[in-house]
Amino acid sequence: MFSFKQFSVQQDKTAMKVGTDGVLLGAWTPINHNPISILDIGAGTGLIALMLAQRTSAVQIDALEIDEEAYEQATDNFENSPWSDRLFCYHAGLDEFVEEPEDEYDLIVCNPPFYAENYKTNSEQRDLARFSDAMPFEELIEAADLLLSENGILSVIIPYKEEEKFVTLANEFELYPIKITRVKGTPTSETKRSLLVFSRNKQNCEQDILVIETDRHVYTKEYIALTKGFYLKM
């Protein structure tokens, strides 16, 4: 079990454990437009939905998970949290979910499966969770276009090397980047991840860099400020 300040995440049944990417997305995603409805696509343990339940007063926080064991785990984590009345997990793939959309969402978040590299681990479950063929970027962006409310935003974390491709695809659906944060492990390491927010409304795109640590377990003040509401030791 992974314990945060206001909730805990059981992760024994799912291949995707709590990791820096999920925590970053959950903590960084802008909420200044006061979302009432939120959708977490590919919820895994439910971590990001739980973080957004803590950060927002959204009355409807839906999560979507295709893997049965992860779905069960996310449901348990939601029920055991202080916000169980606002959280709900659907056991479905994105393609099924968008066939009959019942709601629009003010915020859609996704930590999509990646590793386009041709490599397999010994765990089929982990491969499903990590492979971009499990959820192509096109499918995610098209779904966001269908499901976002007029002033809604899409927030994702992806490998930095995929950023240009993702932005180009989003533009085809008239979704435009309004905030980009590029993430580096240390000041001298290469950029590993991109945090991106898209809107239907074109505006100046705010861009910055986030460095996680200056030395092993010596976190930058920016990273501490971002995550201190969640990590027990921050």
From Swiss-Prot:
Gene Ontology CC: cytoplasm
Localization: Cytoplasm
Example of a GO biological process term: tRNA processing
Keyword tRNA processing: yes
Domain of life: Bacteria
Known catalytic reactions: adenosine(37) in tRNA1(Val) + S-adenosyl-L-methionine = N(6)-methyladenosine(37) in tRNA1(Val) + S-adenosyl-L-homocysteine + H(+)
Gene3D superfamilies attached to this UniProt entry: Vaccinia Virus protein VP39
PROSITE patterns: N6_MTASE
Principal subcellular localization: cytoplasm
Function: Specifically methylates the adenine in position 37 of tRNA(1)(Val) (anticodon cmo5UAC).
Family label: Belongs to the methyltransferase superfamily. tRNA (adenine-N(6)-)-methyltransferase family.
Protein's name in the database: tRNA1(Val) (adenine(37)-N6)-methyltransferase
